[in-house]
Design a protein with these regions (language model features):
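Short structured motifs
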Residues: 126-130, 188-189
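Short beta-strand and beta-hairpin "edge-sheet" elements
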Residues: 170-215
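Oligomerization/assembly interface segments of phage tail-like spikes and tubes
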Residues: 130-149, 197-212
Length: 216
């Protein structure tokens, strides 16, 4: 049993990336291994994947490699199921994060989506309703910050909004754990005008990959 508060969590946006590398394969294993010629990744590097599988836009950490230099391990990623990860699923790209900008003065964080949806039906002969799960709603997060256009994150978030591409968002928890998300950024940088309150500005992100990645 445990109890944890998010107080002290720091969110950061990845603002620069190394050149994209081609991934030619990902193994079916309890710890997946990716093949990429001269990738140059080291243990601890944060990488976002791009392919046509369940790992598309998934953020991963590179594990210690006891393998040839053209291979790198995907820490905590289990691809042993050939049903979920059929042959050829891993062909795609990988991009390493090279810097993050911390988002300060956050006063509120809200999450939405992820609700399980169902298909329901009734057979004429017995009149009983049945249901089975279908999909989960797309997920999003909203961060409210005290407005300050002189802080680095302000212009970085505007640039990410204008780019319209996928970014890595990091949540560094007070326990030392880290959660990574791949997101589309929505931010116009405009302040609120509520009397007798700090001016606020709102960051909205939609998750490109519905599954976050957590590392202790």
């Amino acid at each position: 049993m445990s109890s944890s508060f998010p107080n002290g969590t720091v969110f950061s946006l990845a603002t620069s990336y190394a050149a994209t590398k081609t991934v030619t394969a990902i193994s079916n294993a309890t710890t997946a291994v990716a093949s990429s010629v001269s990738h140059g990744y080291s243990a601890g590097d944060i990488v976002i994947l791009g392919n046509s599988s369940r790992l598309d836009q998934r953020v991963i950490r590179v594990a210690a490699n006891a393998a040839p230099t053209d291979l790198f391990n995907l820490e905590g990623i289990d691809t042993s199921s050939t049903t979920l990860y059929p042959s050829g699923f891993g062909v795609g790209t990988a991009s390493k994060v090279t810097s993050f900008t911390a988002i300060s003065q956050v006063t509120d964080v809200q999450s939405a989506g992820g609700e399980q949806q169902f298909y329901q039906w009734v057979y004429l002969e017995d009149g009983r309703q049945r249901q089975r799960p279908t999909f989960k709603n797309a997920r999003s997060m909203t961060l409210v910050m005290d407005y300050d256009p002189d802080l680095a994150w302000h212009d970085d978030l505007i640039a990410a909004d204008l780019a319209g591409t996928v970014y890595v968002l990091k949540a560094s928890l007070p326990s030392g754990a880290v959660i990574y998300y791949s997101v589309y950024v929505g931010f116009d940088g405009e302040p609120s005008f509520t009397i007798n309150e700090n001016q606020k500005t709102v960051l909205s992100v939609s998750l490109a990959c519905p599954t976050s990645t957590r590392y202790a």
